[in-house]
């Protein structure tokens, strides 16, 4: 054998030493007349060529619906190498697998254009990895035993009937604040609600309020919800291609203030209030997102 990087033959051991042979895995016997060499083989990858690996669900997979997915592959991507991913899922109506792969970024949420599902049938979900390398010495690596996908189903519908009732309602997506009791002497006459939200075309955000005067003999639970008016950015929608286009929305009671009539008595102030936000959408993949809620009780 030649010395690495030269045309000179290896003529001898450059370092003084002995070869130790293991005996019964406990003692070592030296041999002064022998040495140990290794032959190391490596793969020779084709530069800039592509290789594909396709992963499918097994037949015992629980059925799930998906409006948003995130693939989580365990992979090693070294410098000058790359892995790109695509997915196929099953159509909700036709129960057939998508024809083409949709490009996704690993460990990043991807909002589907329409709801999809993974069924109990093997192959109702596919993820395809495309591996490339700019070096003949190295390749990206995928751990096939730790390749997973997270699916998120949005629970939302497009009805708002019975939402003014004291309790219940037909909308699925609702958020109700806890009951707020103002300090003695700080009774309010009006409410102002501010939301920072994404509202795509086809989706709506409705804000309701419920108030109770300290002089009212009814209980808070008996009071009905009242729909508020949107007073800024009315009917405006966020762009459909981004999840960062938030709108500043403001809501206030429909009348001059939040006074109400109960048992023929008009109450001009209130001590207790709560807010209910009702979200609806014609598509489960285009849902409102709210990241900030501010409620101001005005005297």
Where are the model-predicted features located?
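Beta-strand-rich ligand- or partner-binding modules
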Residues: 9-299
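Extracytoplasmic/surface-exposed domains of secreted proteins
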Residues: 1-2
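Ser/Thr/Pro/Gly-rich, low-complexity intrinsically disordered stalk/linker tracts of secreted
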Residues: 5-6
């Amino acid at each position: 054998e030649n010395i690495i990087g030269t045309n000179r033959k290896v003529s001898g051991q450059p370092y003084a030493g002995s070869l130790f042979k293991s005996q019964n895995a406990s003692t070592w016997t030296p041999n002064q007349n022998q040495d140990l060499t290794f032959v190391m083989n490596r793969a020779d990858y084709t530069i800039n060529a592509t290789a594909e690996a396709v992963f499918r669900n097994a037949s015992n997979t629980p059925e799930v619906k998906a409006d948003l997915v995130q693939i989580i592959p365990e992979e090693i991507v070294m410098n000058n190498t790359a892995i790109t991913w695509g997915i196929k899922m099953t159509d909700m109506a036709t129960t057939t697998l998508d024809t083409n792969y949709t490009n996704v970024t690993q460990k990043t949420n991807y909002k589907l254009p329409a709801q999809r599902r993974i069924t109990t049938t093997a192959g109702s979900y596919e993820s395809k990895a495309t591996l490339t390398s700019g070096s003949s010495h190295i390749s990206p690596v995928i751990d096939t035993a730790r390749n997973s996908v997270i699916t998120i189903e949005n629970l939302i519908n497009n009805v708002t009937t019975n939402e003014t009732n004291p309790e219940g309602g037909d909308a699925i997506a609702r958020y109700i604040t806890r009951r707020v009791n103002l300090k003695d002497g700080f009774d309010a006459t009006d409410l102002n609600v501010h939301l920072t939200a994404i509202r795509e075309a086809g989706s709506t955000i409705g804000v309701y309020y419920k108030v109770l005067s300290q002089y009212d003999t009814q209980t808070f639970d008996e009071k009905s919800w009242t729909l508020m008016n949107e007073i800024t950015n009315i009917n405006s929608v966020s762009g459909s291609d981004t999840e960062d286009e938030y709108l500043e929305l403001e809501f206030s009671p429909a009348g001059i203030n939040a006074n109400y009539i109960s048992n023929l008595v008009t109450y001009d102030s209130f001590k207790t209030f709560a807010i209910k936000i009702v979200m609806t959408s014609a598509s489960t993949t285009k849902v409102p997102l709210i990241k900030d809620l501010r409620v101001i009780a005005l005297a």
